[in-house]
Curated annotation (Swiss-Prot):
One of its GO terms (molecular function) is zinc ion binding. GO terms for biological process: 'de novo' pyrimidine nucleobase biosynthetic process; 'de novo' UMP biosynthetic process; pyrimidine nucleotide biosynthetic process. This is Dihydroorotase. Keywords: Hydrolase, Metal-binding, Pyrimidine biosynthesis, Zinc. The lineage of its organism: Bacteria, Pseudomonadati, Pseudomonadota, Betaproteobacteria, Neisseriales.
Length: 344
């Protein structure tokens, strides 16, 4: 039977929620990943160092006994951020600030209205070596939802990089050929995370034969040519600029199967297996370890994990749902098969 042993991966973009939801989902990530970069879009958002440290304590309390998993904490960038906050964050071990353009995604109402007013804050991030994580979509209602990432590149990303050229930027959960091209052409201070869904699915998987609410995420799934461009990027000559970030975003089944359903796909349960499928299909299984376990750590300036995990070429059936607080949670590929299984 085919096996693949890799350095334990890290999830560089993860939503863990809070309360009972946190307790339900944290063990899935802790089982596979050594570390994860934790998104700060709680209600209310994680905007201060005190907020982040308190949230980290709640995450640690939700982990299985004996778990070595380490959450890497971030702050939610708001219009009120200051250079002093950046210095405080650095001193407290916060790894990054996250940009949510106001209204772009789940719990983004506190997001930034004009990023260019925060240039002194971004300059301090560059000085302190704190990363700038970007949800790269414009929120202009006149821009089609399928074009919002591409529009963001010209309107925001390129001008910001021109003004703060040494800022370390992660273009999060990229979905388009344009975003991949920006990262490929930018300096080594610019990298990107890519989700399993944007490597495996296209917008037909969302809309053909009926609306598939469990395939609805933001940024929304794009056409097949974009999916192919992402696969080419993560397996190509400059693959070191791309790394694993699931954007696993749990929502109760009732909130997804809804007249106004929430955006987000829960993939943490079988994340590395889904990525293995991508790299296998691309004939690039030898590049999975760098994507999952090396590139992100290098970009964040942290050591690689010292232990390993082993994947076996053995099919598994994903559960139709799993418990989630008072409700249930539908994982990515619920009821379907994945060709790889982690040996636990």
């Amino acid at each position: 039977m085919q096996t693949l042993t890799i350095i334990r991966p890290d999830d560089m973009h993860l939503h863990l929620r809070d309360g009972d939801a946190l307790k339900a989902v944290a063990p899935y990530t802790a089982r596979q990943m050594g570390r994860a970069v934790i998104m700060p879009n709680l209600k209310p958002p994680v905007v201060s160092v005190a907020d982040a440290l308190a949230y980290k304590a709640r995450i640690m309390a939700a982990l299985p006994e004996g778990s070595a998993f380490e959450p890497l904490m971030t702050l939610y960038l708001t219009d009120n951020a200051t250079p002093e906050l950046v210095r405080e964050a650095k001193a407290a071990g916060i790894v990054a600030f996250k940009l949510y353009p106001a209204g772009a995604t789940t719990n983004s109402d506190s997001g930034v209205t004009d990023l260019f007013k925060l240039i002194p804050v971004l300059e301090e991030m560059a000085k302190q070596g704190i990363l700038f994580l970007v949800h790269g979509e414009v929120t202009d209602p006149e821009i089609d939802i399928f074009d919002r990432e591409a529009a963001f590149i010209g309107r925001v990303m390129k001008p910001v990089l021109a003004q703060v050229p040494n800022l370390k930027v992660v273009f999060e959960h990229i979905t388009t050929a344009e975003a991949a091209r920006l990262v490929l052409e930018a300096g080594d201070n610019v990298a990107a995370t890519v989700t399993p869904q944007h490597l495996l699915l296209n917008r037909n998987d969302l809309l053909v034969g009926g609306v598939r609410p469990h395939h609805f995420c933001l940024p929304v799934l794009k056409r097949e040519t974009h999916r192919q461009a992402l696969v080419a990027a993560v397996t190509g000559e400059k693959a070191h600029k791309f790394f694993l970030g699931t954007d696993s975003a749990p929502h109760a089944k009732s909130a997804k199967e809804n007249a106004c359903g929430c955006a987000g796909m829960f993939s943490a349960m079988t994340a590395i297996e889904l990525y293995a499928e991508v790299f296998e299909k691309a004939g690039a299984l030898d590049k999975l370890e760098a994507f999952a376990s090396k590139n992100g750590a290098r970009f964040y300036g942290i050591p690689e994990n010292t232990d390993t995990i082993t994947l076996v070429k053995q099919s598994q059936t994903v559960p139709a749902s799993v418990p989630y607080g008072d409700g249930e949670l539908v994982p990515m590929r619920a009821g379907g098969e994945i060709g790889w299984t982690v040996q636990y």
